[in-house]
C-alpha cells in the first residue's frame, strides 16, 4: 500500500466581491492526503457550526493521493459578527486546524 499522507489544508475567506453581493462563503481546501477519508468540522469563535456546511467526497488526484473541499455558506452579517472561523480537518486520528478572521476594515 501507500504510506499515509497528512492533508495540507488551506482556508479561504469570502471575497470582497462576494460580500458586496451579500453572500459569504468560506472554502476549506484539503489536499494530498492518503487514505481518502477525512472528517471536516467548522467552528465560529471555537463553537461548532453545523448549518450551511457542504463537504465534497474525496477524489483521487493524479498523484494517487486524495483531495476534498468543504464549503461554509454564511451571510455577511454572520461573517462579520464573529472574530474567527476555523476549518478543522481530522485524518487518521490527527487534526489540522486553519483559522481565518474577518478583516476589521472592509
Swiss-Prot record:
Gene3D superfamilies: Immunoglobulins
Principal location listed in the UniProt entry: secreted
Taxonomic source organism: Homo sapiens (Human)
Gene Ontology, cellular component aspect: extracellular region; extracellular space; IgA immunoglobulin complex; IgD immunoglobulin complex; IgE immunoglobulin complex; IgG immunoglobulin complex; IgM immunoglobulin complex; plasma membrane
Cysteine disulfide partners in this protein: 28-87
Keyword field: Adaptive immunity, Cell membrane, Disulfide bond, Immunity, Immunoglobulin, Immunoglobulin domain, Membrane, Secreted
PROSITE patterns per record: IG_LIKE, IG_MHC
Description of how the protein assembles with itself and partners: Immunoglobulins are composed of two identical heavy chains and two identical light chains; disulfide-linked.
Full protein name: Immunoglobulin lambda constant 6
Localisation per UniProt entry: Secreted; Cell membrane
Its biological purpose: Constant region of immunoglobulin light chains. Immunoglobulins, also known as antibodies, are membrane-bound or secreted glycoproteins produced by B lymphocytes. In the recognition phase of humoral immunity, the membrane-bound immunoglobulins serve as receptors which, upon binding of a specific antigen, trigger the clonal expansion and differentiation of B lymphocytes into immunoglobulins-secreting plasma cells. Secreted immunoglobulins mediate the effector phase of humoral immunity, which results in the elimination of bound antigens.
GO annotation, biological process: adaptive immune response; B cell receptor signaling pathway; immunoglobulin mediated immune response
Amino acid at each position: 500500500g501507500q504510506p499515509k499522507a497528512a492533508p495540507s489544508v488551506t482556508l479561504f475567506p469570502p471575497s470582497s466581491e462576494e460580500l458586496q453581493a451579500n453572500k459569504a462563503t468560506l472554502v476549506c481546501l484539503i489536499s494530498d492526503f492518503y487514505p481518502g477519508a477525512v472528517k471536516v468540522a467548522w467552528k465560529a469563535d471555537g463553537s461548532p457550526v453545523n448549518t450551511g456546511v457542504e463537504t465534497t467526497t474525496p477524489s483521487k488526484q493524479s498523484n494517487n493521493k486524495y483531495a476534498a473541499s468543504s464549503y461554509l455558506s454564511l451571510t455577511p452579517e454572520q461573517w462579520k459578527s464573529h472574530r474567527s472561523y476555523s476549518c478543522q480537518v481530522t485524518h487518521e486520528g490527527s487534526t489540522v486546524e486553519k483559522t481565518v478572521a474577518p478583516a476589521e476594515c472592509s
